[in-house]
Amino acid sequence: MNHDFQALALESRGMGELLPTKKFWEPDDSTKDGQKGIFLGDDEWRETAWGTSHHSMSQPIMVQRRSGQSFHGNSEVNAILSPRSESGGLGVSMVEYVLSSSPADKLDSRFRKGTFGTRDAETDGPEKGDQKGKASPFEEDQNRDLKQDDEDSKINGRGLPNGMDADCKDFNRTPGSRQASPTEVVERLGPSTNPPEGLGPLPNPTANKPLVEEFSNPETQNLDAMDQVGLDSLQFDYPGNQVPMDSSGATVGLFDYNSQQQLFQRTSALTVQQLTAAQQQQYALAAAQQPHIAGVFSAGLAPAAFVPNPYIISAAPPGTDPYTAAGLAAAATLAGPAVVPPQYYGVPWGVYPANLFQQQAAAAASNTANQQAASQAQPGQQQVLRPGAGQRPITPSQGQQGQQAESLAAAANPTLAFGQSLAAGMPGYQVLAPTAYYDQTGALVVGPGARTGLGAPVRLMAPTPVLISSTAAQAAAAAAAAGGTANSLTGSTNGLFRPIGTQPPQQQQQQQQPSTNLQSNSFYGSSSLTNSSQSSSLFSHGPGQPGSASLGFGSGSSLGAAIGSALSGFGSSVGSSASSSATRRESLSTSSDLYKRSSSSLAPIGQPFYNSLGFSSSPSPIGMPLPSQTPGHSLTPPPSLSSHGSSSSLHLGGLTNGSGRYISAAPGAEAKYRSASSTSSLFSSSSQLFPPSRLRYNRSDIMPSGRSRLLEDFRNNRFPNLQLRDLIGHIVEFSQDQHGSRFIQQKLERATPAERQIVFNEILQAAYQLMTDVFGNYVIQKFFEFGSLDQKLALATRIRGHVLPLALQMYGCRVIQKALESISSDQQVISEMVKELDGHVLKCVKDQNGNHVVQKCIECVQPQSLQFIIDAFKGQVFVLSTHPYGCRVIQRILEHCTAEQTLPILEELHQHTEQLVQDQYGNYVIQHVLEHGRPEDKSKIVSEIRGKVLALSQHKFASNVVEKCVTHASRAERALLIDEVCCQNDGPHSALYTMMKDQYANYVVQKMIDMAEPAQRKIIMHKIRPHITTLRKYTYGKHILAKLEKYYLKNSPDLGPIGGPPNGML
């Protein structure tokens, strides 16, 4: 009831924000005989699971905590165990996080009271762990973990109050936690040979079968013992069920009251037939005394000989919980039931109340359903009566039996789907999902849909029959015929749903198509389903239109799914609900892991967890998958099928991949799903029976960060061995991510041609986008390096027509440069690319990005193709030479262009040599000419320098040119420059003395010492010697002294020859 107020506190929280984790419960010894269900009283809190420091809104405004009165009216269990607050009255969100789909332990209530300690030791003991092989190369040995879990369970007097084995921690809030792989879970939770004493389970002939294949559902190996005797555990699955093993099949409901089946745990005192008869009597009485849900009960009995229903009825005082052990024991005596107050439920527009309830028709449907189910149950106790939506049939005949029994549910009465959805409600509530209503305590309960604009399409209805369209009625009739039932159209539609117009069933559409059961029910499902499942679609055009989808609901969505969706956020858990017993589905509830990512049922993270397409999910009853869909009947809120609803909805639940399979936030946790089924819920058309060997992510699954789930998983190191082929459909996105781009670059270097082609096919369509991307441009460049010629030319063709904007763009200019480097200049595409710059040369040259493109063109393209660049420079050489980027282009021209092309450039340079040598950029051009130019060009520059050596040597930029003149001038020119320094006087001192003290000129002196011929060097030394004492006072004079000391140490005192100069010109 309080679920939605809890949701208010969680609405804005993204799934990425995993909180610091505390244990929910610390082990301690508790021998109290009080209720040990999941709803613990105030006195039974062991430790606050989350502190208020993390959740300032964990106690919503105006929600007062009621001590001693929980929402289901039991004063003994007076608080709800909430994961978000130490205030116990805040809803069921712990269930979504902790117990969500199927905790692995179904415990006898007597074991809960203190004798449970030996169970894990017997089933998951060290010897069990030692026998288990590693399920995955990425999984480390888990013996230590298993033993630790055993220790905890032994210490814990209550067993595990949340009904979940510690190993089942798929959605663990600790990011570093390990997780069990699907196969590992099967092996670890595998066949149990040591049942606890007192439970007396029936033999399970399939429990000890080895794991058949990697993808086989754990339920196939660990069948529910209740299934063996034809007793079906219900959605509310009040455990205590006689399953002595951790089994994903033995899924436990959210509200773990332990007592629903306590009625049957008289240690084999009653036979199966007696139990079944007793339960049918109970429900018949309940239906009689509560006629408005008689159809619900009758439909609920259809899938198996017995379907426990949460809406029974205890003779206990009205103030007590009708679902406690005492209440059920009283109900077993068939005393007067305690009627649960009816609630309002939300119904989509277009479904109208009938205000009439044909009890006789409902009773007939109930009888028929019971008889059919009983007859289905009789043929053999060794065959599982209801394999469940997540299991494969053990034998073909059994699969047919299961299909018929399952389809009987929708066939017997259209109230099945709605009734089973009702049955999924919380204790005390018989309806699914009102957007807002008052509960029996007078508190206003607002459904999560109210915050996401769901109020409009859903209205409150009294719990009366509703009218449905004639096509849906025909669908129900066709389902009845296909399911093998003898119900007439009238009998099958006179229950909770009444047709607007009745028509005879279409017999020609009654053939069964078991193979098409395996199709994934995508949200806009166009997959072909059986008539029994398809014809029960609420909004389908008719039973004979496999691919039709009207009003946005997949034609494969079952009647229960559609009605349940209107009331519970499309809570059908996707499978073909009425006839999916033989389908291979990994439903959310079929896994022993907490949030095992199902094949096609869960909402992607960051998308609405509760609702899809604007339909309300259940606030307190938590809209349930139908019993025929989910073998474990977990109380997990039905996730939206494809997250097409409002992205502002509640972000609850675990991390999922693109197909919606829940994963842990722990790094490396994704490894175990690499070979598991994960077909996408939205785009999948592949069979669930044969899941793909590699993960498939949904392109539309966008994380709150904007990244897809595959990329998010990769960034969080969940894919240690990701390959390029795993990125199909995500290449462009990965290329635009820092880590994804680096990954693709590394793989492309060693990729096979086929793998490169896979990548190339995707990036070619987004080539321009990637070329201008900060990370994507590197992937394009890598293709220019390692791609085939055809691939290079194809990418170059994408550049063509965009050369100028790319050249001026920070990242695009790099792509163009790489293309120019990697493609031969004689290719026509290169010439065409270069010609696009014609008319924009100066713009590019002066651009910080474009100048690199022009330089690369000059370097890589034939000079004859670059005449337009030379022409553009005419009259602009001085300006460009003094430009920070233009000076670079001038130097490239001088290096690579022909003499005819460089001649006009040099002439302009010589005209401005004096200015250029003193310019911060122009001096580089002059130096470049001195280093690489022709001798006549060097001589022209030296002649410009002569007579100005002293002045220019003291200039910051010109001093560099003077050094280059000393280095690269001819011997005669060098001697003239040195003599100018030695012989010239600067006031009282020589020019040499002035230069030695100068911060720039001292480098010219050092260069002269190095380059001078021996005779000239001796003269320089004698000129310097008188100033040695003075030079020691100056910072730059010390450089000269260091140079002198080097020569004095190397040479004789007379400063004779010291060998040739460094340039070898002597």
UniProtKB/Swiss-Prot annotation:
This is Pumilio homolog 2. It comes from Mus musculus (Mouse). Residues 959-963 are annotated as: Guanine-nucleotide binding in RNA target. SMART domains: Pumilio. Residues 1-260 are annotated as: Interaction with SNAPIN. The modification Phosphoserine is found at S67, S70, S82, S102, S136, S177, S181, S587, S592, S684, S700. Residues 106-203, 368-408, 490-551, 620-650 are annotated as: Disordered. The modification Omega-N-methylarginine is found at R674. Residues 368-383, 503-514, 526-540, 630-650 have a biased composition (Low complexity). Residues 851-855 are annotated as: Non-specific-nucleotide binding in RNA target. The pumilio repeats mediate the association with RNA by packing together to form a right-handed superhelix that approximates a half donut. RNA-binding occurs on the concave side of the surface. PUM2 is composed of 8 pumilio repeats of 36 residues; each repeat binds a single nucleotide in its RNA target. Residues at positions 12 and 16 of the pumilio repeat bind each RNA base via hydrogen bonding or van der Waals contacts with the Watson-Crick edge, while the amino acid at position 13 makes a stacking interaction. Sequence-specific RNA-binding protein that acts as a post-transcriptional repressor by binding the 3'-UTR of mRNA targets. Binds to an RNA consensus sequence, the Pumilio Response Element (PRE), 5'-UGUANAUA-3', that is related to the Nanos Response Element (NRE). Mediates post-transcriptional repression of transcripts via different mechanisms: acts via direct recruitment of the CCR4-POP2-NOT deadenylase leading to translational inhibition and mRNA degradation. Also mediates deadenylation-independent repression by promoting accessibility of miRNAs.
